Regions:
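Hydrophobic anchor at the start of a short beta-strand
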Residues: 38, 62, 254, 283-286
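Nucleotide-activated donor-dependent transferases that construct or modify glycoconjugates
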Residues: 252-262
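Iron-sulfur-associated redox domains of electron-transfer enzymes in respiratory
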Residues: 1-250
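Active-site catalytic pocket residues across diverse enzymes, especially alpha/beta-hydrolases
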Residues: 54-57, 278, 282
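Short N-terminal binding/cap micro-motifs at the start of the first secondary-structure element
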Residues: 190, 262-267
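Active-site donor-binding segments of glycosyltransferases and PAPS-dependent sulfotransferases
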Residues: 281-324
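Short amphipathic alpha-helix
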Residues: 268-278
Length: 324
């Protein structure tokens, strides 16, 4: 919470990691009870969370701004990234910038500044944290089912980057960033009226044109299908590069071919023990299925098959012809 325009820099810049807003909620509640004005800015879920804590509190002095959200990556993953790749646990990290315009302009790239004055710059395809974040491989599971990335929005105003603005109107971009501002309520109208004449560009566009950009305005971004595999690899000790590569390309270190699907408990226990021993070495395992008699053949419903589905990664079933 800031009290002076001089401190606005503390609120600026993108922060692509989940934040704990619980203390801020208590502070906002206290300030509102004092009869003071509060402008709260956060993701849609954080705005909704704030309102949920303010029952029986006069909120006439509260103005809320929600951000169109890509989803929040795991805080532990971010902490591990800073420690393993940048030596945060050794006191080497001074600052992290997810979108540093000084180096990359209006874009999504990673900058880490070190205490010795050196700087790390990587594009979104080069940096392992960004590479997993943008396709929603590393975002939290519940972000893929967000209840707040929809219309009507939770905040009095919604803000977002207007990605693709040059396709809409080239005159509306200077390469430094153009924002979408959605006014959602009478409180939002008050805010916008107070700042409208201070904006460098102030053009009204149809809501349908915003929806066409594919932004998370009326829908959330779904988790990537490879998300679970990615975190399995991370949990098993893989680097972020290897976890991403194996999850995206469906790669494994070891393949086991045999009668692991055999309908007797001895076979099930033996192959499970082998599977777990290999995994204990930090290796990923694919259980290779027997050839199918014909293309598209299903798998029998046996206790061994049900056990395998719960504990293994299984290959598809191919005919001998398909495997050639």
């Amino acid at each position: 919470i800031i009290e002076s325009p001089d401190d606005l820099d503390k609120l600026r810049k993108s922060k692509y990691v989940q934040a704990d807003a619980s203390k801020v909620y208590a502070d906002v509640k206290k300030i509102l009870k004092e009869g003071r004005v509060v402008v709260f800015c956060g993701c849609g879920c954080q705005v909704a969370g704030l309102y949920a804590t303010l029952k029986n509190v006069d909120i006439s002095n509260l103005y809320t701004i929600d951000l169109m959200c890509h989803g929040g990556p795991s805080p532990k993953l971010f902490d591990d990234y800073l420690n393993k790749y940048h030596g945060k646990d050794q006191g080497k990290v001074a600052d992290v910038g997810f979108r540093d315009k000084d180096y990359f302009g209006w874009s999504t790239e990673m900058t880490v500044k070190y205490t010795d004055g050196t700087v790390y710059h990587r594009t979104r395809t080069q940096d392992p944290y960004y590479r997993a974040f943008l396709p929603c491989i590393s975002t939290r599971k519940f972000c893929g089912h967000c209840a707040y990335a929809k219309l009507p929005r939770t905040g009095d105003i919604t803000l977002a980057d207007f990605w693709g603005i040059q396709k809409y109107n080239r005159d509306y971009t200077d390469g430094k960033g153009t924002s979408i501002v959605s006014v959602n309520s009478p409180q939002g109208e008050k805010i916008y009226a107070a700042i409208a004449d201070k904006l460098l560009l102030n053009k009204e566009i149809p809501c349908d044109d915003v929806l066409k950009t594919g932004q998370p305005f009326d829908h959330c971004f779904k988790n990537h299908p490879a998300r679970q595999r990615y975190f399995e690899q991370i949990k098993n000790g893989s680097s972020m590069e290897k976890a991403y590569d194996y999850a995206i390309k469906d790669k494994y270190d070891v393949g086991i071919y045999g009668v692991w699907f055999g309908a007797n408990y001895g076979s099930v226990a033996t192959y499970y023990a082998l599977h777990e021993i290999i995994r204990s070495f930090g290796l990923s395992v694919l259980m290779i299925d027997m050839p199918a008699a014909k293309t598209g053949a299903g798998k029998p419903d046996t206790h061994a098959r049900r056990f395998a589905k719960a504990h293994y990664h299984e290959s598809k079933r191919y005919t001998l012809k398909d495997m050639r």
